[in-house]
């Protein structure tokens, strides 16, 4: 693959190389929802199912739709390489409340919360329709709010408030508490970006 966008391509190439040496038995022992048929891993992301070939990486959408963006593919590689099942206790956390959240809160606010506020808070009806199209469950928080399953066992809530004459639109993203152990802070930023982009693509 010819590298044109180094910011996205270089991390992908790094994890693609590590993926070649991955032991499928190790993956399915850590991630109970991931299946391995001897040629492909089956992975579900935000309601869509993908086949990921191994050892020579290739990704296919089972629904025949578009394959994910390169940053999303990089995340899926990291998920297979590093993630594990962690039980959810049923509680929710903001990004700031999880390990290293305070350190990353400024870039996270701009990349995730402000973007979500002005993408969804200004178009609540379109947000609702997109979330429902993705199979998300409505929640009672915010002017509009929905719960999504990112990958098996890891849940997120996207909450949006419309602005008015005094206040701009607002948004909050909640993570099931197992994200604190299951994903590092950098991944939690990327995950928020993936969720926002996926909802937006369905609007």
Give short role names for the model-derived ranges.
Residues 1-39, 71-72, 80-134:
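Short Lys/Arg-enriched alpha/beta "domain-start" segment
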Residues 27-55, 137-162:
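Amphipathic, interaction-prone secondary-structure segments
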Residues 50, 104-112, 116, 140-142, ...:
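Domain-length accessory/inserted modules outside core catalytic folds
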Residues 62, 66, 117, 144, ...:
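Short, charged/polar micro-motifs that form catalytic or ligand-binding hotspots
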Residues 67-89, 174-203:
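Ampiphathic alpha-helical segments that act as solvent-exposed interaction surfaces
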């Amino acid at each position: 693959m010819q590298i044109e966008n180094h910011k996205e391509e270089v991390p992908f190439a790094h994890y693609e190389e590590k993926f070649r040496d991955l032991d499928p038995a190790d993956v399915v022992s850590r991630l109970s929802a991931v299946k391995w048929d001897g040629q492909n891993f089956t992975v579900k992301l935000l309601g869509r199912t993908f086949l990921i070939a191994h050892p020579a990486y290739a990704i296919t959408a089972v629904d025949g739709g578009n394959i994910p963006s390169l940053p999303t593919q990089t995340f899926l590689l990291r998920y297979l390489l590093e993630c594990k099942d962690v039980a959810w206790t049923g509680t929710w956390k903001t990004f700031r409340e999880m390990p290293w959240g305070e350190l990353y809160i400024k870039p996270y606010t701009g990349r995730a919360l402000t973007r979500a506020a002005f993408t969804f808070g200004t178009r609540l009806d379109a947000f609702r329709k997109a979330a429902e199209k993705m199979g998300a469950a409505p929640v009672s928080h915010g002017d509009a709010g929905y719960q999504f399953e990112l990958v098996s066992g890891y849940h997120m809530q996207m909450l949006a408030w419309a602005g008015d004459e005094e206040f701009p639109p607002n948004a909050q993203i909640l993570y099931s508490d197992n994200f604190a152990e299951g994903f590092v802070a950098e991944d939690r930023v990327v995950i928020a970006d993936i969720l926002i982009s996926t909802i937006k693509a369905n609007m």
